[in-house]
């Protein structure tokens, strides 16, 4: 069993100036002021729409972010459906395979301190879950069922 810290990774290559220019172009449609676009107008324009509370214009740029977090946290994120999500799936991932190192990966809980009794109980529970998962696979269950 591998214990890891939660983390995020931005997968979209980001160019700050290009992002600002794209948002400016979209936002200026609202104000019919496309003719005011210059090489240096984007940052000031975007700051202005934020100051005016016109944040919807910011939605015209998207990024892809990889979240590695507790399943409960990921379910809170996707529940709000403010974006599109892809998530590691127990339906399609068989953790007994070499690609996973023949082990499950669990996220280190932020609410427990390593070495405390709570930490030890949590770790034992995770090991038992891992053992049960592999036994269910051995008995013929699919990864989704296990």
What are these regions (language model features)?
Residues 1-145:
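Family-specific signature for flavin-dependent thymidylate synthase
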């Amino acid at each position: 069993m591998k214990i890891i810290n939660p983390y995020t990774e931005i997968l979209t290559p980001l160019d700050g100036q290009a992002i600002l220019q794209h948002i400016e172009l979209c936002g200026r449609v609202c104000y019919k002021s496309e003719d005011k676009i210059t090489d240096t107008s984007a940052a000031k324009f975007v700051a202005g729409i934020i100051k005016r509370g016109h944040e919807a214009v910011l939605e015209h740029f998207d990024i892809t972010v990889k979240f590695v977090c507790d399943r409960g946290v990921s379910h809170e994120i996707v529940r709000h459906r403010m974006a599109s999500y892809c998530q590691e799936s127990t339906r399609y991932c068989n953790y007994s395979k070499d690609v996973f190192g023949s082990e499950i990966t669990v996220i280190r809980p932020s609410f427990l301190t390593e070495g405390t009794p709570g930490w030890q109980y949590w770790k034992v529970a995770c090991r038992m879950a891992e053992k049960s998962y592999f036994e269910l696979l051995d008995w013929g269950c699919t990864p989704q069922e296990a």
